[in-house]
């Protein structure tokens, strides 16, 4: 079976590197980049791969369950790498509702779409994977310096992290979480 992978947040800083890596390293995979193109998304990051035959960009909101579910059916998705998130600290203070909507409800939308679609297949979850890329902030601050725990901007990421763990335990054979710490590159300098 040919692999077909949705990468959410694929026009963002980390996501664009992941999309490029998969498009170039796995020419037999179908890579579907789903991004809402908010302040953090920039398709110019992917100009060099936009015409690759195994690449597709879909402008969509991960909170739009119907669109995500239909896309999974259309593309026969076998895996998800979920990077889409609100992460800008100043924005989280000004507009916590947007953070909660994207980070919690968007993650739930992705998890539920994957669950329902993969359950509908004869092979169910076999060979399917859901990777959730979060943040090291879900662990909170080290107690010796900051006993107050997780700072408000990161509570939504902690919630999405917990939803992923719960779905992984109850529904999926293969789930992986990754919580990077201070990603950096020359383009971010």
Task: Outline where the language-model segments fall.
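N-terminal Rossmann-like NAD(P)+-binding domain of SDR-like oxidoreductases, especially those catalyzing
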Residues: 1-189
């Amino acid at each position: 079976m040919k692999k077909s992978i949705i990468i959410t947040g694929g026009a963002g800083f980390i996501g664009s590197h992941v999309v490029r890596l998969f498009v170039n390293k796995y020419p037999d995979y179908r890579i579907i980049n789903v991004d809402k193109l908010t302040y953090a998304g920039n398709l110019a990051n992917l100009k060099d791969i936009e015409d690759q035959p195994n690449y597709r960009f879909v402008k969509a909101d991960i909170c739009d369950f119907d669109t995500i579910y239909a896309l999974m059916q259309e593309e026969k998705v076998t895996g998800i790498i979920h990077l889409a998130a609100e992460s800008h600290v100043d924005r989280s203070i000004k507009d916590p509702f947007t953070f909660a909507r994207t980070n919690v409800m968007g993650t739930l939308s992705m998890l539920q779409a994957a669950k329902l679609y993969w359950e509908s297949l004869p092979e169910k979850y076999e060979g399917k994977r859901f990777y959730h890329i979060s943040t090291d902030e879900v662990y909170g601050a080290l107690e010796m310096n900051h006993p107050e725990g997780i700072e408000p901007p990161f509570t939504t990421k902690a919630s999405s992290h917990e939803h992923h763990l719960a779905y992984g335990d109850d529904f999926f054979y293969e789930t992986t979480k990754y919580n990077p710490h201070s990603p950096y590159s020359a383009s971010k300098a």
